[in-house]
From Swiss-Prot:
Activity regulation info: Allosterically activated by fructose 2,6-bisphosphate.
Organism: Solanum tuberosum
Family per record: Belongs to the phosphofructokinase type A (PFKA) family. PPi-dependent PFK group II subfamily. Clade 'Long' sub-subfamily.
Pathway as given in its UniProt record: Carbohydrate degradation; glycolysis; D-glyceraldehyde 3-phosphate and glycerone phosphate from D-glucose: step 3/4
Site (described: Important for catalytic activity and substrate specificity): D202
Compartments in which it is found: Cytoplasm
Pfam families: PFK
Protein name per UniProt: Pyrophosphate--fructose 6-phosphate 1-phosphotransferase subunit beta
SUPFAM superfamilies membership: Phosphofructokinase (SSF53784)
Annotated positions binding diphosphate: G107
GO cellular component, one term: cytoplasm
Positions bound to Mg(2+): D201
């Protein structure tokens, strides 16, 4: 078993009381759990623990519109995906002295620090004398040349720790000619051999654009991506999961499990829990598989079935009524953050409101409503008053409705309450309904990474280092065979262009890495669908408890990944 070695101080002693310079992290004031994680050994795939070589696969294509992707990436399109394989020839080029940069891009996800640690340790082991720069504050740090030189002492307090505060992240993009020029100047100034971009689909799209730009300018700087997002929507056959998803789902599942026990204890509340996931519903689906709630809404299914908001409300109300017949006046309902974006009629209403409010003032008499189509007017009148006001009053700087600020869980509580009141009047429901709302979001982004995420991220970083040393660019670090023991994991790089499609924006084709949505024919959804009726009417609640770092379930992997890999979870 190849294992990570702990970073040492110059005197050979562990940096247990070291403050990471300029960041404020003191390992000396960590909790016992945090300190135990600092020294947690990280096994590596066996291919990374012995001499290896990088082998090219066949030429790659694109996820969609290959002819357009080829035009947008003339230097990179078609390059092969690569694999690391053992090499006993003795020809492996070691101890190159490299200058490598790393940048965190986008929202936080547990495990990011271990990606950085993996890159650093690879350089320390295989490229002695190399320098690693951490760009501060995300892509803006690359453009402005703001960085810190990473050292063993600097990195040590962050090993196996949550957060992105080692160098911090940002949501800036390198996309205009001026911004590309700034990035070029930084790369030249630091004489960078490589740059690792740790981010989600947008960030890795930008990483590919940067790799194309550097190659077209004959810069030696190579660019490698690493797949990050708790939403779980950056994945493919070659990139089985994005890091952070495993940890975030386990954190949310613990909280949901606690709420379930509370619901059962009081016997009088329905808990409506909104979960992160602006686009795909992967987090909601995984948390359902881990906890067995009474109702779980999956945005992709709502869209596929063309369900209306009234349909969704009626479905929840039906479950509430049926449970009341069994004496259960409580329950737990999971809602994906992006639910509204999957309901076509809501999108139509928002589009009409944006158009009307761009030219008219909302009058108290409601004359403006006459400009809504009959279907949208009916939907608007169906919404709770608080949501109506939110749609009309809370606008972004462009005057558009701020959909992300709509508290879907509170909206559904009010709509279900109204529906149940109507059923009471008809004698179809005679119990009491009380709703409690929750949003579990930021709580999951910076937790201590699970054993899986800690190890997976370390391997991603180590793999990224190997790809850069091998002269590769425009790839995303890929670690596979994740259902097997760590030693049997595969390591390689997937062509970023192979993950891309195009969208038409402002009359031009723009490259995008396609988000991986919940597949209704996929194994995770099918397993959920086969169980949900039983979960709805009975109490099959599971409280998984906190993330375990030792013991029989410490290395357990999330259901979604195992089911997608063909392993029964």
């Amino acid at each position: 078993m190849a294992a990570a070695t702990l970073s040492l101080l110059n005197n050979g002693e562990l940096a247990s009381s070291v403050k990471s310079p300029g960041t404020g992290r003191y390992a000396a004031v960590y909790s016992e759990v945090q300190n135990s994680r600092l020294d947690h050994p990280l096994p590596l795939p066996s291919v990374l623990g012995s001499p290896f070589k990088v082998v090219d696969g066949p030429p790659s294509s694109a996820a969609g519109h290959p002819e357009e992707i080829a035009k947008l990436f003339p230097s990179l399109y078609g390059q092969p995906c690569v694999s690391l394989v053992p090499d006993d020839s003795g020809d492996v080029a070691m101890n190159q002295i490299l200058k490598i940069g790393v940048v965190l891009s986008g929202g936080q996800a547990p495990g990011g620090h271990n990606v950085i640690s993996g890159i650093f340790d690879y350089l320390q082991t295989h490229c002695k004398g190399s320098t690693m720069y951490g760009f501060r504050g995300g892509p803006a740090g690359v453009m402005k040349g703001k960085y810190v030189v990473l050292t063993p002492e600097f990195i040590y307090p962050y090993r196996n720790q949550g957060g992105f505060d080692m160098i911090c992240s940002g949501r800036d993009k390198i996309e205009t000619p001026e911004q590309f020029k700034q990035a070029e100047e930084t790369a030249k100034k630091l004489d960078l051999d490589g740059l690792v971009v740790i981010g989600g689909d947008d960030s890795n799209t930008n990483a590919c654009l940067l790799a194309e730009n550097f190659r077209s300018k004959n810069l030696k700087t190579r660019v490698i991506g690493c797949p990050k997002t708790i939403d779980g929507d950056l994945k493919s056959k070659e990139v089985p999961t994005s890091f952070g998803f495993d940890t975030a789902c386990k954190i949310y599942a613990e909280m949901i499990g606690n709420v379930m026990i509370d619901a059962r204890s009081t016997g009088k509340y329905y808990h409506f829990v909104r979960l992160m996931g602006r686009a795909a519903s992967h987090i909601t689906l995984e948390c359902a598989l881990q906890t067995h709630p009474n109702v779980t809404l999956i945005g992709e299914e709502v869209f596929a079935k063309k369900l209306t908001l009234k349909n969704v409300t009626d479905y929840i109300a039906d479950v509430v009524c049926k449970r009341a017949e069994s004496g259960y006046n409580y329950g737990v309902i999971l809602i994906p953050e992006g639910l509204i974006d999957f309901i076509p009629e809501v999108q139509q209403l928002i589009a009409e409101l944006n158009e009307i409010l761009a030219h008219d003032v909302v009058d108290e008499a409601g004359v403006w409503k006459k400009k809504l189509t009959p279907q949208c007017l009916e939907l608007f009148e169906l919404l709770p008053l608080a949501i109506q006001e939110q749609l009309l009053l809370e606008r972004d700087p462009h005057g558009n409705v701020q959909v992300a600020k709509i508290e879907t869980e509170k909206m559904l509580i009010q709509m279900v309450e109204t529906e149940l009141d109507q059923r009471k009047q008809k004698g179809a429901y005679n119990a009491q309904f009380k709703g409690q709302s929750h949003f579990f979001g930021y709580e999951g982004r910076c937790g201590l990474p699970s054993n899986f995420d800690s190890t997976y991220c370390y391997a991603l970083g180590y793999g990224a280092g190997s790809l850069l040393q091998s002269g590769k660019t425009g790839l995303i670090s890929s670690v596979g065979n994740l259902a097997a023991p760590v030693e049997e994991w595969t390591v390689g790089g997937t062509a970023l262009t192979a993950l891309m499609d195009v969208e038409r924006r402002h009359g031009k084709f723009k490259p995008v890495i396609k988000k991986a949505m919940v597949e209704l024919e996929g194994a995770p959804f099918k397993k959920f669908a086969s169980k949900r009726e039983e979960w709805a009417l009975n109490n099959r609640y599971i409280n998984p408890g906190p993330i375990q770092f030792v013991g029989p379930v410490a290395n357990k992997v999330n259901h979604t990944l195992l089911l997608e890999l063909g392993v029964d979870a």
